[in-house]
From Swiss-Prot:
Superkingdom of origin: Bacteria
Keyword field contains Transmembrane: yes
Listed PANTHER family: ATP SYNTHASE SUBUNIT B', CHLOROPLASTIC (PTHR33445:SF2)
InterPro entries per record: ATP_synth_b/b'su_bac/chlpt, ATP_synthase_B_chain
A Pfam family this chain is assigned to: ATP-synt_B
GO molecular function: proton-transporting ATP synthase activity, rotational mechanism; proton-transporting ATPase activity, rotational mechanism
Protein name: ATP synthase subunit b
Length: 175
């Protein structure tokens, strides 16, 4: 407790000593006021001005960053929208090309079938024509053979014994 008593006495004595010399108190007050004015003029205003400029610069940068962020978001949205549109167009183009290719495939197959039918019909007509021609030749040959056989029979060159030989000879000649 002695320590506290000593501290208390020292503070009391210091306060009493301040007020014993008023001229020192006035000089102290004047020096403090001058110090405050000097600090206010030479330090406070420049520091405040610097801090305000720094605050404005930071605010401006934050505003620009927010603006850039909005711009980036807008560009991203536009690109995403454009990507979706292009993707949709590509899908439609693919579907259109696939359907056109399918139609072209069907057309080519149909044309090939029609061409095959036409060629088969042409071959059938050619075969029928050839059959008619060969039939006519065979008829003509039969007529000629029959006429020749009849001539030989009428001229008495053919007998019952050699008729088969004569017919075979004539067939060999005509064919």
């Amino acid at each position: 407790m002695d320590i506290f008593k000593e501290i208390s006495d020292a503070i009391q004595e210091g306060l009493n000593s301040i007020f014993e010399r008023w001229d020192l108190v006035l000089w102290q007050i004047a020096a403090t006021v001058i110090l405050i004015i000097v600090v206010r003029i030479f330090l406070w205003k420049p520091i405040t001005r610097y801090l305000e400029q720094r605050q404005e610069a930071l605010s401006k940068e934050l505003h620009e960053a927010a603006h850039e962020r909005e711009r980036v978001a807008q560009i991203r949205y536009e690109l995403q929208t454009e990507y979706e549109v292009m993707r949709k167009e590509a899908r439609q183009m693919k579907d259109t090309l696939m359907s056109e290719a399918q139609l072209e495939k069907e057309r080519i197959i149909s044309d090939a079938r029609n061409e095959a039918k036409r060629r088969i019909q042409q071959v059938d007509r050619d075969v029928q024509q050839e059959l008619r021609l060969q039939s006519e030749k065979i008829r003509e040959n039969i007529k000629n053979i029959a006429f020749d056989v009849a001539e030989k029979i009428v001229s008495h060159q053919v007998t019952d014994e050699n008729i088969d030989e004569v017919i075979d000879e004539m067939l060999d000649e005509k064919l």
